[in-house]
């Protein structure tokens, strides 16, 4: 563990080492006059009295390779800073959830043909175990409006941190399951949200955000100790069960289900890619709405894809390929999502990549 006192000691040692450099140190060893060099006896090149001692030019030193911090568990990497960072060119920015790039390669389709149905059956069997229906029932200080505000704030936060849609879905699942079993005070509700985001990122992402990043986004209203302690509490309350099926998984499954045929054309692949992109934006809107808390992720995925197909005027409806749900239940969920989209048209267009112009999507269709 690196403490403040240890850091001060290291800084003092570093300063002493720089002062005792090779250009200024004195010879401490005793030598005979015969061992002295002409430079030591002053017999070297004649010195000009008008010219002072020539000093070496100082150049800024940079590391050839940047230090990569690997220990990011529970923010351990926040304790260590790179002593001399090297100038690195900024990485190109990408649109969040930009799925308009080709996402259905031959290897992925073949893997889906081999294992897709087994993965779907397994995740479908886990839905009810991870579904937190009426999670605010025993929350006297947390209302549906507060939950909506928190998740609406987490959406741009997770985009700012370049996290995937899977992380956001898992964050909301962890948040709702914790609210279902533990009363939460209103003044620490935001801390519960960012802690859920940290746990979900560790479960899904290869480079989860740092603790100090999350605390800075909260305007440093909470301490590092509070966040780490709450992280342990959430994990204990959920019994470390974090592998919840998400809307994102079922969106990918149903989309791949459309293009598994050998006769799938490039047009069908393009339409499917656009549909799943719009469906993710619709699903993001639904995550913040407490009215969809009782619907399973697989049902939400089917309904979001149906609304997306309708908005994009596609002729390949997803419902014809899915027969696991009652028609009345699908109609009920689709009706609520249709109302949600019609009331949040501007928000939906802001959530979608820039390729989707407003004119290309018929929200009122």
Swiss-Prot record:
SUPFAM superfamilies according to UniProt: Cyclin-like
Keywords: Cell cycle, Cell division, Cilium biogenesis/degradation, Cyclin, Cytoplasm
InterPro entries, per the entry: Cyclin, Cyclin-like_dom, Cyclin-like_sf, Cyclin_C-dom, Cyclin_N, Cyclins_cyclin-box
A GO cellular component annotation in the UniProt record: microtubule organizing center
Biological processes, Gene Ontology terms: cell division; cilium assembly; G1/S transition of mitotic cell cycle; multi-ciliated epithelial cell differentiation
SMART domains registered for this protein in UniProt: CYCLIN, Cyclin_C
GO molecular function terms noted in the UniProt entry: cyclin-dependent protein serine/threonine kinase regulator activity
Record carries keyword Transmembrane helix: no
Similarity comment text for this entry: Belongs to the cyclin family.
Protein name: Cyclin-O protein B
Top-level taxonomy: Eukaryota, Metazoa, Chordata, Craniata, Vertebrata
Gene: ccno-b
